[in-house]
Amino acid sequence: MSDITVVTTFHKPGLDLYGQRFLDSFAERVDKRIRMIVYAENCDPVNPDPNQITILKSEHSLPKLTEFKQRWKDEPKANGDISADPKLSRRKDANKKFKWDAIRFSNKVYAVFEAYHQRPSTWLVWMDADMYVHSDWSYEEFKQLLPDDKYITYVGRGKGSQTWPECGFYGMNLNHPLCHSFLENFEQMYEDAENGIFTLDEWHDSYVFGEILNKYREFDGELDYSADMYLREAKSGGGGHPLINGPLGKF
């Protein structure tokens, strides 16, 4: 069993725009001891290294995702339309539909949930498929980002207006009991969406992730990669984009 497994997902437009580029860069520059699981939604990416990368069909491998989409596909609020909500529809940003597009972001979270249940490694790491690995990334450098005394690692945004994490990269220590509790709570927010995500002020994955994280703040064991880069209160925390300007930016 690999010590570290990365998980990602994309659909056909994503494959063409960025997904294949990401897979190729990962296979070329990331240490071969770090594996990847790809959930491909109705598309057929070229696997640059089948020994390192496993590609699965989302439509066959993510039954809970299929059920979630079927359950909510005709519900406007699950697709970003909050015009019928007396409270949320009055928000100044009510036109930013992505904040309430639960269907769109469900692909990502259900890929994480399924990989978690499969227990492929000690560490499970989510990476957005629109990333690009521009420099060689050794096992030691990758592992340094995943300390064993932490149950979760993530990229925060500081104290600005966007206080939800930047969920393009986060690590989950599957050997830590708090991580199991966190992920089970995260999944339950979607499985019982009416009493879960739809009770929140927003329901894109980063906001939901942040709400769960806040509930676990009383416990030690989280690592925010960008905690030291914030200089003042601002939309980005005052230090620029947290992924690019934090420790992940070197790769």
Where are these regions (language model features)?
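Conserved phosphate-coordination/catalytic loops
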Residues: 13-17, 102-106, 200-203
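A structural signal for well-ordered alpha-helical segments within the folded catalytic domains
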Residues: 20, 106-110, 203-211
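GT-A fold catalytic core of metal-dependent nucleotide-sugar glycosyltransferases
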Residues: 100, 104-154
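Catalytic core and acceptor-binding pocket of nucleotide-sugar-dependent glycosyltransferases
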Residues: 172-251
